[in-house]
Amino acid sequence: MSLEILDQLEEKIKQAVETIQLLQLEIDELKEKNNQSQQANDALRSENEQLKSEHQNWQERLRSLLGKIDNV
């Protein structure tokens, strides 16, 4: 009887270890996806700042041109 219980316990431990290993793999995959998402986010933020700067420069140039037209 006790041998049967030990076998059951061993099987449950093996299943628990397998589950833990699978969860660790999933965690590693999610960490990698998170890192990739963070890099993409950083790149998009940088691009957004660059585009805002370009937009502001264009607005200033347009204002300057409109000012010159008004002076004519």
From Swiss-Prot:
Pfam families recorded: ZapB
Entry GO CC: cytoplasm
Localization annotation: Cytoplasm
Superkingdom of origin organism: Bacteria
Compositional bias per record (Basic and acidic residues), positions renumbered to this chain: 44-57
InterPro entries in the cross-refs: Cell_div_ZapB
Gene3D superfamilies xrefs: 1.20.5.340
Main location: cytoplasm
One GO term (biological process): division septum assembly
Coiled-coil stretches: 1-72
Entry annotated with the keyword Transmembrane: no
Matches recorded under HAMAP family: ZapB
Biological role stated in the UniProt entry: Non-essential, abundant cell division factor that is required for proper Z-ring formation. It is recruited early to the divisome by direct interaction with FtsZ, stimulating Z-ring assembly and thereby promoting cell division earlier in the cell cycle. Its recruitment to the Z-ring requires functional FtsA or ZipA.
Name of the molecule in the record: Cell division protein ZapB
Top-level taxonomy: Bacteria, Pseudomonadati, Pseudomonadota, Gammaproteobacteria, Pasteurellales
